[in-house]
């Protein structure tokens, strides 16, 4: 798999099935997106997970949690559209081991995919930042933004790995496109048509701050009018 070092979603990713194909794909990809990395291809049938960790200046884990990417767009692999908090301590420890080896400090986001050939969760990438989906763990009880603020202010952040399970976070715009493009639209669990629940939250909307949602949808509608931005969002 050929992947740009700087990108988002699945933009720029391509798959080479031979050394010759890799040599053919690399120059135009690098020319368009900049430096790239080459990774082993893992069949996308395996579940994808995110391990979110906060490490102090001594690379000790203060907060750690995991959520599963139940749906994502494009359906063959990309940014998540529905996430669910789960308990996978071995994935937290695997991410922590990698970050400690790097002397990590602050927020670390580790992406994993379970290889269906051997059942092992394997690292895809590490992001040194908050991800768009961090809210699912915040709603589950791990307030990463606040604890990172405390760490930056020289305070001692709370240390815990306790959080609520089966909390869902949905990104509705991309989930709508997923529904249009996925063959599993009527087989997915939980159902695509479940829009309300005490355990269900939205990335782009909150009753506690509704105007941000209004602003988001207004900008999204403007993007749909622009042909270039529309193609980028609906790639």
Say what each PLM segment does.
Residues 1-15:
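Conserved anion/nucleotide-ligand pocket segment
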Residues 7, 42-47, 103-106:
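A short catalytic or substrate-binding loop motif that flags glycine-/basic-rich loops and adjacent residues
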Residues 10, 70-74, 79-80, 127-141:
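Glycine-rich phosphate/pyrophosphate-binding beta-alpha loops
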Residues 17-77, 83-96, 113-122:
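Phosphate-binding site of ATP-dependent enzymes
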Residues 101-135:
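Conserved metal-phosphate-binding beta-hairpin within the catalytic cores
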Residues 143-151:
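C-terminal helical cap and adjacent loop that interface with cofactors, partners, or active-site loops
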Residues 150-235:
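Peripheral (often C-terminal) accessory segments that flank ATP-dependent C-N-forming ligase machineries
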């Amino acid at each position: 798999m050929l992947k740009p070092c700087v990108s988002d979603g699945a933009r720029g990713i391509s798959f080479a099935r031979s050394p010759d194909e890799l040599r053919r794909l690399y120059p135009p990809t690098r020319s368009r997106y900049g430096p790239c990395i080459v990774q082993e291809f893992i069949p996308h049938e395996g579940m994808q997970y995110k391990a979110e960790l906060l490490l102090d200046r001594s690379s000790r884990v203060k907060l750690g949690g995991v959520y599963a990417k139940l749906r994502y767009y494009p359906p063959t692999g990309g940014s998540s559209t529905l996430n669910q908090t789960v308990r996978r301590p071995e994935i937290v420890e695997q991410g922590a081991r990698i970050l400690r080896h790097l002397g990590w400090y602050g927020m670390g986001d580790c992406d994993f995919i379970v290889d269906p050939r051997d059942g092992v969760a394997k690292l895809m990438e590490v992001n040194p930042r908050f991800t768009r989906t961090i809210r699912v763990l915040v709603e589950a009880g791990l307030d990463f933004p606040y604890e990172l603020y405390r760490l930056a202010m020289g305070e001692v952040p709370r240390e815990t790995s306790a959080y609520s399970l089966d909390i869902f976070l949905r990104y509705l715009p991309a989930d709508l496109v997923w529904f249009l493009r996925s063959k599993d639209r009527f087989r997915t669990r939980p159902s695509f048509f479940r829009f309300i629940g005490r355990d269900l939250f939205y990335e782009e909307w909150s009753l506690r701050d509704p105007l941000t949602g209004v602003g988001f949808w207004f900008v999204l509608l403007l993007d749909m009018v622009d042909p270039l931005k529309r193609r980028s969002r609906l790639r």
